[in-house]
Each structure stands twice: as structure tokens, then as C-alpha cells.
């Protein structure tokens, strides 16, 4: 009330992020689940590379102890694009990942069809010259503008995918395959199986934004995860204790 009475403009967070994406190259991660880890991973890959980025994340990065990263020089802004209340419709992405479209927030959307329509509309907001990186096999129909390139990704197939997956002794190594490169023997800093797929999406964003193969490889190995996202608090031969948000529709 004080701010309104004194002439301040008040905006929702999503509206402010929309303003930011109109004045920078927004790298957005949308989807029912996986978006916090994927966006935080992508932000780390870019932040530790020569490309750099600003980032507004939906969780606390364990690498940086914050959900906000700032760069005075990078044109890129990594944003977790939240579909709740259709808030991601305020954004103007340069590139976007869509991780999943399992129906959620039906108190807002009412039906599965309305939920999927919201994602279709979101894809129309991606700016010409940019890209959509769509999880292979989703029910939704993309509707991108002319000049937007659409890629697919998943763990095992798509334009971006993983091969030669090796899991053992608490470690995961993969080869990352992209349309124009292959990065072998990448170690996942957080050796959780779902992070193979999250990592493919994050590496796709970083690669398309100009990070080098070596920067991507080093960044994946040094990624420490997100607070309360499969967060190991205790791990020994007898006990594994995890803290996790544990939200899935």
C-alpha cells in the first residue's frame, strides 16, 4: 500500500523477467519438472565459460550459494520459465528448453488441453534467430515463428543426446552428441541418472550460446547441484540421506 500510495510501479516477478528478456538474449528453461536443475546447470556452464551470463534461478545453486548470477558484459540471461499462472507468457526467449509437459497446476488451467495450449503459445514467443530445444516425444505441438530453429533432445536420441553412458562407483560419464560436435568422456558433477537428461539440455543451451567443448566438459564436472534437488546431506557405506523438494505432478 505504501508503495502504491507514493507512486511506485509494482510488477510481478514474471513481468520484470519479461522486461529483462526483451533487452537481453533470454535462455529460458520451461517444463513441468527438471527446469530448476537444468537452468542452474546451464547457468553454471555459461558463467564459468568465456561467454558468461546473468541468471535468475528457481533454486539455490550449490556452486554459488545464490539463485542470482550477474554479468556486466554477457548478452545472455538464463531464466527458469515457470508455467504457473501462465507467468512464462511474459517472457521473450531467445532460446528455450522445454523439459516436460506432464499436466500440473490444474487449479489454474482446468484441463490438460489448456495446459498443453499454454506451452504451445509459449513457443510462439521465442524470437526469430533463436531456437527451441524440445524434449523428444512430448505431446505438445510447437508453433514457433519463422526463423526459429527447433531441435530435439533426450537421454538416448534426438539432435542432442548422450551416448556411451557409464555408471558405476558413484560416478557417471557420458559422451555428448550434438548436430555439429561430440564431446567425449564428460563426468557429471552430480552423479544422478536424471542429470544425464538434464545435462544434455543444459549442454545444448551452452553449446548453441557459444561455450567451447572444453568449457562445457569442465563445467559439467564442476557442477555441484541445486539445494534440495537430490541434495546429498550424508553419504557413506551404510546410509544415504537426501534432501529433496520431491514435487512431481
Residue ranges and their predicted role:
Residues 2-136, 140-149, 200, 206-207:
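Phosphate-binding loop of NTP-binding sites
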Residues 109-116, 146-249:
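Adenine nucleotide phosphate-binding catalytic loops in nucleotide-utilizing enzymes
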Amino acid at each position: 500500500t505504501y508503495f502504491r500510495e507514493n507512486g511506485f510501479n509494482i510488477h510481478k516477478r514474471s513481468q520484470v523477467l519479461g522486461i529483462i528478456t526483451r533487452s537481453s538474449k533470454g535462455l529460458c528453461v520451461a517444463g513441468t519438472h527438471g527446469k530448476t536443475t537444468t537452468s542452474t546447470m546451464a547457468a553454471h556452464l555459461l558463467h564459468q565459460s568465456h561467454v558468461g551470463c546473468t541468471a535468475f534461478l528457481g533454486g539455490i545453486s550449490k556452486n554459488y550459494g545464490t539463485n542470482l548470477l550477474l554479468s556486466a558484459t554477457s548478452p545472455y540471461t538464463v531464466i527458469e520459465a515457470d508455467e504457473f499462472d501462465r507467468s512464462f507468457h511474459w517472457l521473450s526467449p531467445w532460446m528455450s528448453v522445454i523439459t516436460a509437459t506432464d499436466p500440473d497446476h490444474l487449479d489454474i488451467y482446468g484441463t490438460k488441453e489448456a495446459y498443453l495450449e499454454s506451452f504451445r503459445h509459449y513457443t510462439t514467443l521465442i524470437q526469430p534467430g533463436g531456437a527451441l530445444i524440445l524434449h523428444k516425444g512430448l505431446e505438445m505441438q510447437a508453433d514457433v515463428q519463422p526463423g526459429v530453429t527447433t531441435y530435439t533432445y533426450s537421454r538416448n536420441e534426438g539432435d542432442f543426446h548422450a551416448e556411451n553412458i557409464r555408471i558405476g562407483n558413484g560416478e557417471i560419464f557420458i559422451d555428448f552428441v550434438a548436430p555439429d560436435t561430440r564431446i567425449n568422456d564428460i563426468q557429471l558433477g552430480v552423479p544422478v541418472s536424471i542429470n544425464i537428461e538434464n545435462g544434455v539440455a543444459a549442454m545444448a543451451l551452452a553449446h548453441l550460446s557459444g561455450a567451447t567443448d572444453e568449457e562445457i566438459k569442465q563445467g559439467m564436472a564442476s557442477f555441484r547441484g541445486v539445494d534440495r534437488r537430490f541434495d546429498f546431506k550424508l553419504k557413506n557405506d551404510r546410509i544415504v540421506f537426501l534432501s529433496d523438494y520431491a514435487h512431481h505432478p
